[in-house]
Amino acid sequence: MKKYITISREYGSGGHTIGSIVAKELGIPFYDNEIIDLAAKDSGLHPDFIKKNEQNISSGWFYTLLLGASYATPGTGSMHLGMNSATSAAPLADQVFNAQRNAIIQLAKKGPCVIVGRCSDYVLRHCEEIDRKDILNIFIYAPLADKVQYAIKTKGLDPATAERDVKLIDKRRANHYNTFTERTWGNRAHYDMLINSSLLGMEKTAKMIAQIAKES
């Protein structure tokens, strides 16, 4: 049985829901937003800052300067990011990525689990404490029309805005992944399976993944 299942996903493909069901089927923990909380606790970065910027910025000093203005303390011009001195030396994007990477490794070392997003497939592959043979990397995608409908239903958006948001979020996810892993997001060479969640629906897709994890 595969002990660690990573779920990379396009926005609107149902990856979070699928990952949650997989975890229940296997009787193991499911981690998504928990990664943000742990990363914030260990790094000193504010949880809201991590959540807002985890896929919005790329590595480099320019983005540190750019974001610094947005998070300056009013009337002082000084940065206030809720971070400790140990993290403040690195570019903000690197701080966010490193904090989440460390959180993913900490959670995985506790035992078998399902992890959604945040380059977890790449992080676990390069973690010496985790055997690569125990990892199942899944990429969930869906047709654009289905993802747009998902955004309309869950976010209450009009069709045009929903399509724009779907494309923008997927672009951000791709840029983030490509920047920090030097891989190509969604490239089949980096995953064990690429699954169109629209074919079977979320629940059946999740049960299929769980069965594969049990038998592989």
Q: What is each stretch, according to the model?
A:
Residues 1-9, 111:
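Pre-Walker A (Motif I) flank of P-loop NTPase domains
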Residues 29-40:
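Short beta-strand-centered segment that lines the nucleotide-binding/catalytic pocket of NTP-utilizing
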Residues 57-66, 74-78, 158-202:
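Small-molecule kinase domains that catalyze NTP-dependent phosphoryl transfer to phosphate-bearing small molecules
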Residues 99-155:
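ATP-dependent NMP and nucleoside kinases share a basic, alpha-helical "lid"
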Residues 6-22:
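Glycine-rich phosphate-binding P-loop
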